[in-house]
Amino acid sequence: QPFCGLPLDWVGRFNRDHEEAVYRCLAGVEGVPRWLGRVGELGYAIEHIRGRPLDHPPAPPPGFFDRLGRIFDAIHARGVAYGDANKRSNILIAPDGGPFVIDYQLAVRRRDDWPWPLRAVVGALVGYIAGRDLYHLCKHKRRIAPREMTAQEEAISRDRGGLHVLHRKLTKPYRSLRRAFLRRQHARGRLVSPTADLEDHYQPEKETWRKKEP
């Protein structure tokens, strides 16, 4: 839909092309849904994964986070950094207890086909974000399965890093404004999903703006 009269089709097209490139790069990696193809002018379809998000009880079975760690290792080995591992809702627990990682909109992939120094900059960014992926993985493990933690994982889960702390401080005003805007829109009934009847309405990540305005 247009925003302030400006067409935004190019944003949808960019997001679709970006995720397609990432999914194709990760084809065959265990725990990554399969790319199925484009749908319509801007849409696309991926493999349906039957499972529940990590932020839904009960806790995952023993060994879940070790398997998840191997998935992230495989993703990183393909030159892709996930970039959204802080959201538990992006990590699914399949009926057999195995992990799946979904939603690659924020993923960054290495671009060896780009000229230097662009490929060097992107490569450094991929390396940094991959490190943040491991930080969030270990943080989730510490909070959900602390008895399975190793000493190294414990250290990683506590190491936010200077850039991470700076990012949190700089974006705090934006997050507050965004949360207030979403809360107001939700109260006015403007954030109703077209697939609401098909959704699991236990969605903890949305509770910060689903609360009623004081």
Please state what every model-predicted region is.
Residues 94-210:
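C-lobe/activation-segment region of protein kinase-like
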Residues 23, 50-55, 158-166:
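Short, electropositive alpha-helical surface patch
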Residues 2-7, 52-54, 115-123:
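Short glycine/proline- and charge-enriched loop/turn segments
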Residues 1-24:
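ATP-binding glycine-rich loop module of kinase domains
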Residues 33-43:
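Short beta-strand micro-motifs within the conserved protein kinase catalytic domain, predominantly
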Residues 19-32, 52-105, 134, 140:
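Conserved kinase catalytic-core helix
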